[in-house]
Amino acid sequence: MIGIVSYGSYVPKFRIRVEEIARVWGEDAKKIKDGLGVHEKSVPGMDEDAATIAVEAAREAIRRAGINPEEIGAVFVGSESHPYAVKPTATIVGEALGVGNDYFAADLEFACKAGTAGMQICYSMVKAGMIKYGLAIGADTSQARPGDALEYAAAAGGAAFIIGENPIAEVEATYSFTSDTPDFWRRDLQPYPSHGGRFTGLPAYFRHVISAAKGLMEKYGYKVEDFDYAVFHMPNAKFPVRAAKMLGFSMEHISQGLVVKAIGNTYSGSSLLGLAATLDVAEPDERILLVSFGSGAGSDAFAIRVTDAIENYPREPKVWEKIERKAYVDYAIYLKHRRKIKA
């Protein structure tokens, strides 16, 4: 039995409200909140980046698992905002965690689904007998052009998952759906991404998320009724709710993992933070459907069954408790923290 042995999460404490961003740009905050379903977003501190977020989440996962870091045989960090263009984040994380030198490391990029790609690779390496434990992380300090619609939701945060045998949650099955879809992109040397506006919806997000979820269920014989929870990538709060309804899930299935309302879209950390929040309350034999999405475009779907081992697993502090620990900043401080003001 292979799956999630442990998990950890990290959410920066700083927040900025939609009203504050809208005030600066002279826009209607209520209309934006109604349209996105997002009320505020997380903001990284000046000394925080994807690497520090990854380290914090991974440290929690290792502490909870009670394992020796040197037992980890692979480290994968998925992100759109790696600190270096040339120099892996994964080696920074491995060094900070004390993994040693005898491990495989790689950075992954696939927009917002790079973290789940890491989970699939770790799962495969454990299953093949190559490693005892694999560490898959999704972490981002996502960028948005000032004044762009993305600015209201592009946030920071991440989650880490240790994959191995004797898990607290078994990965029963996984399935991916991929295409070449130019819905969101950023060229080299460009500081901010471009996007296709409404094109990011039906042809991109919904096509891939729905196809991956249906593909998983059809290939492995699952039905909606087999799942107690569902977690979808959260670019905003509207898309995952609509995707859930399209597949036949209710709000009860997705509400626990719908963290986007309170912290925005953490990109590579989005669906993984939702999964972590769901594992915080899940009981033995409950099943979770996880579906990520990455622009460009692709989705990874997982059927995850919680095991009896979860009962003795230390889940405090929980994701929602971390979300509630916050301090608000105004737009000027936000720009300073995001280093958008150049001296």
From Swiss-Prot:
It is an enzyme of class 2 (transferase). Keywords: Acyltransferase, Isoprene biosynthesis, Transferase. The active site is at E80 (proton donor/acceptor), C112 (acyl-thioester intermediate), H233 (proton donor/acceptor). CoA binds at R198, K238. GO terms for biological process: farnesyl diphosphate biosynthetic process, mevalonate pathway; isopentenyl diphosphate biosynthetic process, mevalonate pathway. It catalyses: acetoacetyl-CoA + acetyl-CoA + H2O = (3S)-3-hydroxy-3-methylglutaryl-CoA + CoA + H(+). Gene3D superfamilies: 3.40.47.10. Its EC number is 2.3.3.10. Pfam families: ACP_syn_III_C. InterPro entries: ACP_syn_III_C, HMG_CoA_Synthase, Thiolase-like. (3S)-3-hydroxy-3-methylglutaryl-CoA binds at D28, A29, C112, T200, H233, R242, N265, S295. Pathway: Metabolic intermediate biosynthesis; (R)-mevalonate biosynthesis; (R)-mevalonate from acetyl-CoA: step 2/3. One of its GO terms (molecular function) is acetyl-CoA C-acetyltransferase activity. Interacts with acetoacetyl-CoA thiolase that catalyzes the precedent step in the pathway and with a DUF35 protein. The acetoacetyl-CoA thiolase/HMG-CoA synthase complex channels the intermediate via a fused CoA-binding site, which allows for efficient coupling of the endergonic thiolase reaction with the exergonic HMGCS reaction. Belongs to the thiolase-like superfamily. Archaeal HMG-CoA synthase family. Catalyzes the condensation of acetyl-CoA with acetoacetyl-CoA to form 3-hydroxy-3-methylglutaryl-CoA (HMG-CoA). Functions in the mevalonate (MVA) pathway leading to isopentenyl diphosphate (IPP), a key precursor for the biosynthesis of isoprenoid compounds that are building blocks of archaeal membrane lipids. This is Hydroxymethylglutaryl-CoA synthase. It comes from Archaeoglobus fulgidus (strain ATCC 49558 / DSM 4304 / JCM 9628 / NBRC 100126 / VC-16). The lineage of its organism: Archaea, Methanobacteriati, Methanobacteriota, Archaeoglobi, Archaeoglobales.
